[in-house]
Amino acid sequence: MDKNFRVNTNDERNIWLSTAVNENLTMASSSSQPQPISSPFHQPENQVNRVNPGSHYYDLETLESSFGGLSFNDSSVGQNGDSIHLPRRTNQVFTGSSSGGAGDDNGYLLPPMGSHHHRELEELQRHNYLNQLRMSYQNDYAHQSYWYNTDGDGNGMLNNGFLNDVPSSSRDRVSDYYTNRFGYEGYNYWRGNEGFDYNQCQASFSAFAKDKEMSERLGMSIFQGTKETVDAIYNGLIGDICELMVDPYGSDVVQLLMRRCSSEQIVQLVDIVTQQMFQFVNICIDSLGTNAIQVLLTCINERAKDQIPRIVDVVRTVALQLSKSNHAIFVILACFRLFPLHCRLLLELIVQNCHQIAIDQHGCCLLQLCFNKDRVPNLEIRQRLIMEAIANALRLCLNCYGNYVVQYIVELNNRYLIDALVRQLIGNYAHLARNKYGSHAVQKLLKLRWIDSRVIVIDLLREIDTLLLDPFGNYVIQTAWFVSKDDVRRMLRYHIERNIPMMRCNKFGNKVLEKLNI
């Protein structure tokens, strides 16, 4: 067969055609006079074969008529390279309306009614119709062309079915993508033409919750469903609740579910989540899991208050681990915000380890958030933590993270707290000014307009000779110059002019002279 001659058909048609060819070969071999088999694809120009049911040419004519409904790459080229002229036809579906081998209006010759080939053709039509209907349902699912009501009313099935203009290749992609996606038999209940059956799908709820599309539908069922619906979903998810809390899609489903849970179900959730401490910590330090735990704390505060001491004690046990995570610190904050009367032991633990927490990258953020009244409304908790930070101010100012805690206290603009901080650091300002991190805290204190900067400047003058030449201290002296007035500035000028010869030989000293125009 010529390489340019290619049949573009489906596997079902190939089966029917191969059957016809085999029967034709059998009849030809049983004939009394052997003769070569004629090719059904080659027809001399202007030649018309009459249909004679009594000869083997009838089967050849039938086979040729069936191929007339197929498309070819080049219909003008025969097997032997000869040109043939056939009527221009497009792919059409056999209707079976003609009978007895008579041709229809388009020149098709169909098998006679009741013949073996006619039964094959009817079966092919039925198979193609069911296959098209199945792909139509799958296309509806892919484009969300359905509506669903969790209360039981509504059709719960796919309604679109408009696939007449969709290419076969597009339909196949839809079918391939959505076929047995998770390997769960229950998954088909979400895509079928029947309503959602919770009993049948209960074993696959976890798989649904982890899928993007299915989790949205599951969340809508939780949000709009009845108590029986919520209970069914709860029973299907409770076994994998810890895993779902840290899942990209399952976490949202769990949070919606917890907001609909009863007090007994909340208690059961607490039992499971706190059963193993390392698992609880892993959930808290996860970016998604921490949100789920915070929702659980909110639900405990609303519907299971008897569980408050228990959950706070669990958080206290692992508080130091949680304070070192940028996600888990919000669990501690949630306890301070929701359960201020039950957090005495937790507060004492944070206070006792204030320095250790403050010099941690994420612990310093925890303390700053605890100082914020919007985050921790309870004044007693805030004051206790702030005063403990002030007591450790000197060591904190020298740390790359701890100095941010001290600076945040300054930014609170509370005179009582700032006066306490200034007094706490007296005698150490020169030492802090020579430190990379401490110099920032000293400069921030000097810039406060409503405090008496004289106390800080006098402390700096004790070591002015070294500060003028120090990589960090020179910036503190420049700040002190601009914020000081009258007699304090005159004292600074005196010491600066006294050190001009030495400052001229040092790049940091020159910076001071250039900045002050001296």
Swiss-Prot record:
GO CC annotation: cytoplasm; nucleus
Task: Map out region (Disordered) in residue numbers.
Answer: 26-46, 77-114
Identify the domain of life.
Eukaryota
GO molecular function of the protein, one example?
A: RNA binding
Q: What is its main location?
A: cytoplasm
Domain PUM-HD, residue spans? 178-518
Q: Which Gene3D superfamilies match?
A: Leucine-rich Repeat Variant
Q: Which SUPFAM superfamilies match?
A: ARM repeat
Q: Where is the composition biased (Low complexity)?
A: 29-44
**Which keywords fit this entry according to its UniProt record?**
Cytoplasm, Nucleus, Repeat, RNA-binding, Translation regulation
The protein's matches in PROSITE patterns, at most eight in alphabetical order, are given as: PUM, PUM_HD
The alphabetized list of GO BP terms reads: regulation of translation
Identify the Pfam families for this entry.
PUF
Give residue ranges of the Pumilio repeats.
Answer: 206-235, 236-271, 275-313, 314-348, 349-387, 388-423, 424-459, 460-494
| Intracellular or extracellular location(s) | Cytoplasm; Nucleus
> Does the entry annotate any disulfide bonds, and if so which pairs?
none
Q: Which PANTHER family match?
A: PUMILIO HOMOLOG 14-RELATED, RNA BINDING PROTEIN PUMILIO-RELATED
Function summary: Sequence-specific RNA-binding protein that regulates translation and mRNA stability by binding the 3'-UTR of target mRNAs.
Protein name per its UniProtKB record = Pumilio homolog 14
Question: What organism does the record attribute this protein to?
Answer: Arabidopsis thaliana
Taxonomy, top ranks, is: Eukaryota, Viridiplantae, Streptophyta, Embryophyta, Tracheophyta
Q: Which gene encodes it?
A: APUM14
